[in-house]
């Protein structure tokens, strides 16, 4: 749907509007169907598991979302930040034996546990974000392909590895790029890919 606008109408009082999700690449969940996206029936049935598409993105702006804008919204990929009850209940399990199991005692902010998980994946053109935050670790913000154009004003983008990636045409005006870091010490990372 084109020209949708999300606005935090209480941002002046310090209230946060948070859109978050817990999917990460390399893991399967009951709530994902064969398309790689959330399915309410699968979440209820808890019968088969599948892996996420599009880096397990919390929010996906499809190419039909032309002119989307957001003001004062926080978009978060919680996968490399903390474990949620919902993630555990969704039967999270690694697709490869080299990946760590995820449970309440897993240090998900360690370098070894870091995996791709996107807070915002943009495939739409002419999108705009003002006073928004994008929180993640690896691959926080996907800017789409060379046909997408976007504008970020006074936004904060956090991550530690390629946390801004894609071929999209993006302008960052007065934005803060913040290195999220790892719990396991000073390990460097790359801002863009």
Language-model features: where?
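Sequence-level preference for short, compositionally simple segments enriched
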Residues: 1-193
């Amino acid at each position: 749907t084109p020209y949708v606008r999300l606005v935090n109408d209480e941002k002046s009082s310090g209230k946060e509007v948070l859109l978050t999700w817990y999917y990460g690449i390399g893991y399967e969940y009951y709530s994902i169907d064969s398309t790689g996206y959330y399915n309410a029936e699968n979440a209820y049935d808890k019968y088969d598991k599948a892996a996420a598409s599009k880096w397990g993105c919390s929010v996906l702006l499809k190419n039909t979302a032309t002119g989307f804008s957001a003001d004062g919204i926080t978009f978060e990929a919680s996968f490399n930040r903390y474990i949620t009850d919902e993630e555990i209940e969704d039967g999270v399990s690694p697709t490869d034996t080299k990946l760590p199991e995820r449970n309440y005692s897993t240090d998900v902010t360690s370098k070894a546990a870091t995996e791709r998980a996107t807070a915002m994946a943009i495939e739409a053109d002419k999108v705009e974000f003002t006073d928004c935050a994008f929180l993640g670790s690896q691959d926080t913000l996907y800017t789409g392909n060379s046909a997408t154009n976007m504008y970020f004003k006074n936004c904060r983008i956090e991550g530690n590895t390629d946390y801004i990636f894609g071929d999209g045409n993006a302008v960052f005006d007065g934005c803060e790029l913040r290195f999220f870091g790892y719990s396991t010490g000073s390990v460097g990372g790359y801002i863009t890919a």
